[in-house]
């Protein structure tokens, strides 16, 4: 290339950055001060030239700093005029904005201006004053502070010093790079054995001009459900993506999403950015392809993006499938018809039927000859094939991902490689995505993957060398697969292979040195297996290191081998971090480096010679100490050496202090009897917790349970074994220890407490957990002598003792089944043996039993908290039912109100432990979509009358509980709180009415049974038609409305809102109702005699979204009109243009209402003229709105005038599509936002996790199952908002069994699912209602 008329070499290893750095070095400046013009020197580039993709033959580049010095610029206006193109070029390059570039360059003009004037005898003060005056009044500098010249002149020495330093550093770096490039060119070819490149796919492309649309518009209008049925294949679109929006075809069977390879999505993740449209098409073959065992579909990735004045459409085709031009043209035809239906009109077949391989013009045809000028003649270019995808292999090698990434980031020789950290780097991905960039190849995207030949079907056995011989490989051979996913020209593949293999040769040479460096900090397992965690690696590089001898083989030179009398075989179980024995010399060296050592034994125990022990090899536990010995030699050796996290020398009363200093031992938990096995602990005995539970409470390792530095001891505390151990454990936790040492008396005492829990009000509390049991069964269970199950009766015990209880249990446990025969009630327990897991690992927070219908509602925390551990012991215990034990804290440090050495079993809700457990519990709940927190309900309970009162007059007497165990109706009376209550009012029965609630946890109230049920099983009653029932609605649902006399009182006291009736409110015959909250509960109370016609208003959210959309598109419309105004008034100054536009084109009309068409497929600016303009003036609905919009436009005009001016060339609005609600919607597809959301959809589908067992609206395909519908059979389901759409779509499914009767299952909160026959054969639908309307699930058998 010629640079300013002189030869400038561009090397194969050059990148865009290194070329620019070397050009700056030649011109003795730095890259940001380069000004690119063509060889004639008069046509300026609007941005930095791309030296990689389109290297110019000749270019002129100016050093703007030097240019300022040589130009005789007399004012800021001349400065701005001279360098206006450079400001644009610098802003478009991305290093800085136009404003920042102007300010940066302005400081050099200021320095040069004052310096030249000073040389001509003009004082510094006068020059600064001239510049300040021009900044105040002139065009060029009015965006800057008036003191700008004075500040720059005072800082000139530092500015010039920094600049010269940067120039010098750039020249040094450029010289190093040029030398390195020359050396790399001379590097011999790699000796690594690699296979030839195998082409797997070709990239086919064609262009479309006169398309008149944007990517978001294409996304909106694309016919995603269109099917192309050819002779050999069936083409269907799976997904369409742009700007991080994903449109997903809802008509494709959900199982097909399992076939989508997430790596393909990640590889093409650039399609998530703006201005690129990505389409995945599924090609389903109609017959088995040659060499294939099945008719599995192939997924084709299509990319659509602007390319100068045309639209470039690219897609990759497998050469083994699409080996004819006819196949490719069918796909091309399908794409054009799908993407541009508005351009083609009706007779698109006539336009596309011929000569698809060459150029063609496609004239749009519209009904009745009406042609739309927005959609001109569509021109489709010829089909081109120049890019390829494929793979080749490096044999008998593997690469370490972490080491290879290090070289890419830190080794200059690897500067032609880079990774895209936004999408490509992940610990979970074994494949590494890399980009190779040189001036010859442009950007090459490829991936690296370590593989091993496992079978003789491996592709390497099929590949031959250039001379026709098979590769020398066998089963077990390791190799690196290199897959090229994008390369501009397939002729550059040999160049890519040669240079990449040279880099691999460098990698293998440098591998060991880098691996050794990393092994100082992290453990890396060779073989590409990734980084392994290692707790005790020293991460402090400044800390002195001791050369530790390499590990010996097991049995050689171990502690047990060196001192067998002291270290018995079970020692390692007692001390997790053993010390090492060191010599006198090594001990001295360790002490000099601040490591401690101890001698043991020092009292001639066992006639042993004392040895020196050190713990320097444990980063986290460097202090040697002693621990109590309970092994077989404990009579000889009271203590054993061990390593600790803290210094035991400083802990008074520790085993260390006792042995070496003669201090008395401080009592600790070790003085209590302590069970360290999974067995059930006896009454009043302590036991350790499973590791995972202990860690939750703050323990680091279960092996440290009795270490002297342990200050957060949590244990399980035993109760008497029995059926009521749950009640016993909670009672002891709150301090009820009556008869705690007398078994029979304690059991009798606890049994009496249990009997009190069988009252009707307590039974109501348990209905969320006993939802699947008859109330009489629950009552008999509580009264029986069967096991009292914590996961069934948790809420009863919580209310009785006024505590909140957290349950913990083993990961393996039991299944409790109840059974009633005549008057006998029994339960059986299917136990899973706990010995199947190592005891130290199991344990978890536990949830009570609850229904899969709806949500499980949690109650707010009470003041006092109890932790209970449930388990079945070990096989040695051979128990019949689980045992409950209290989790306690052994206080080892003084706490408020509690002495050191005491046991704490009752916690407060603000204790640190409770906050930690509550946080973890909340995180656990996040994994259950059907669990939510309930409201705090401040009612006072009166046990004599079994009622709840709130103190304002509301009295709750009964509750209705639905099939899932949630309270949905409260039956209440109103007793006004007044001192003037008359005798007549006292004698009269108070008003009795029904409060319909949101699902809440059951209250301590009697349960009201629903006695009336609809017996007509053959009549399908749509949810919206309950008002047509011949009998009053109250006869069906036992809902009593309030009288009009109570309306005002309830509205005033509880701030309720009066709502007009809607026939959608099927619970109460379209009655008006009060809506709001009573004591934290969302309620609805129906009003008698107030039937009104339906009134549907937009929701607050919908109104908000509409206003947001109006605001953003109005702003862009005004900006577009202003840009047009600038174009037609070039003779005006910026200020004059703005002022005249405001006067001539803007008008405020407070009565004007904007009406936005939500269904524009392509939002041309001209379509909005009638919406925003009247008599050629833009209408603003308020003065404030006009001020806000015009202020922002003024700021843009001042800062980016040229860009604002260019907006007049646009025809399509950019901001029309911004939210999910802005696009067209249809029941046959759904739209999501974000790559992670879509990948989660794909991965969940792969794992079968889209199985719903709750009723809630959803988009796209799901699986659905309910125990109440055909015995829990799993169905494929779609959700619709219309019964007609649901029936129509199911009838169009050719796979439904039309010999079966049609059934609709209506779900209501009282009866659950009820089945009705309908006159549509094979149709199976579930109907349900949520807050925003009715929904219908179509069910299709999966087997």
From Swiss-Prot:
<dbReference type="InterPro" id="IPR043920">
    <property type="entry name" value="DUF5757"/>
</dbReference>
<keyword id="KW-1133">Transmembrane helix</keyword>
<dbReference type="GO" id="GO:0016020">
    <property type="term" value="C:membrane"/>
</dbReference>
<dbReference type="Pfam" id="PF19061">
    <property type="entry name" value="DUF5757"/>
</dbReference>
<comment type="similarity">
    <text>Belongs to the IIV-6 295L family.</text>
</comment>
<feature type="transmembrane region" description="Helical">
    <location>
        <begin position="432"/>
        <end position="449"/>
    </location>
</feature>
<keyword id="KW-0472">Membrane</keyword>
<keyword id="KW-0812">Transmembrane</keyword>
<protein>
    <recommendedName>
        <fullName>Uncharacterized protein 295L</fullName>
    </recommendedName>
</protein>
